[in-house]
Amino acid sequence: MPDFKPSLILYTADALNDRGEAVLAQFPDAERLEVKQHNRLPELGMNHFKVKSDVLVLGKLKTRDVKWSGRSADYIAPSLANGCFGGCTYCYVDRHKNVNPITLFTNVEENMATIDQHVQALSWPKPTNQTDATYWTYDIGCNSDISIDYNLTEGIQQVFEFYCDHPRAKATFATKFVNRDLLDFDPKRKVRIRFSLMPSHVSKLVDVRTDSIEKRIAAINDFYDAGYEVHVNFSPVIVYSGPDGDRKAWRNDYRELFRQLDTALRPEVRAQLKAEVIFLTHNQWQHQANLAINPKAEELLWVPELQESKVSQFGGWNIRYAHQLKSKMVEVFKGLVQEEIPWCEIRYIF
């Protein structure tokens, strides 16, 4: 876990409620600058990683839409934050901003009221599906890493408490960090944490400034013991050859990863653990940016002979593995799971 201590805090006037003021008080030595909009920042004169290390933004989330997912959760909750300390080379959040520091939204009560109103309008009991057998699930961390945000504002714990006490709703988020402060909270199995996993040597290259795969795997038993439901997120799956041209290198590395997972987890933890699997989608703008800041990663991410292009819903040019090849890759991955960790149910894979 990084020790995030911003030297500059940008804030909008409407973000300075009691929670916003508490965040400012947490970092008394930071320079403060009021801005008109949290998502239109002035020129900061810092590079990509410096902004993530040194800048924090406080804002008020005005558009609190709840969006259907059907994959990681039933619904995507309004964002509690946007941006991350990490610098993952494939992150879709970074695609839409020139710089992307952590932005905390301080109107947490309005967020929870939106969720309560939304879930109360849904059918009950909930129809059983792959997201959860009992509760309507909401992904609370699609645009940030909640493990980092948790230490920056008490609002995240308040959100955890809201879901723990709610008779119909359950929270979930994916993370690439191990924040052991979360172990002091009792989530009553109403918060599902999903540790993102990939082969360790690949993670070191593309999961920039995040906790190691070894740390993430080692934390799974502990988070289960603390009362969390724990799943894993094999995402993104990156297909690559070895230095010697071995096209099965990615398969062999995932086999080793699965064996590490099988060895590390206790039987009762395995029994409740499920996985989601998402193969890589990359972006042309991000590819160009990475060539300047992390060109080695692009040797894995940008492989035109394996990929096809598509236009995203935002009008960007994305690439993904070619359809026929990907169908085979999916079957290979499912086969590896069945061979090495047959106890791990795949919730969805694409």
For every predicted segment, state its role.
Residues Y135-D139, K170-T172, K190-R194, E229-N233, ...:
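Structural preference for beta-strand elements that scaffold enzyme active sites
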Residues V57-S72, V93-S196:
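Conserved Radical SAM active-site core
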Residues K215-H287:
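Conserved C-terminal portion of the radical SAM core fold
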Residues N17-G20, V108-H118, T153-V159, T210-A219, ...:
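Well-ordered, non-membrane alpha-helical segments in soluble/globular domains
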Residues S79-H96:
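Local cysteine-cluster metal-coordination motifs and their immediate loop/turn environment
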Residues M1-G20, E256-F350:
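Auxiliary Fe-S-binding modules of radical SAM enzymes
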Residues N143-I148, V178-L182, V191-T210, P236-D244, ...:
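Conserved radical SAM core fold
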Residues M1-D74:
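Flexible, acidic/Gly-rich N-terminal and inter-domain linker regions that tether
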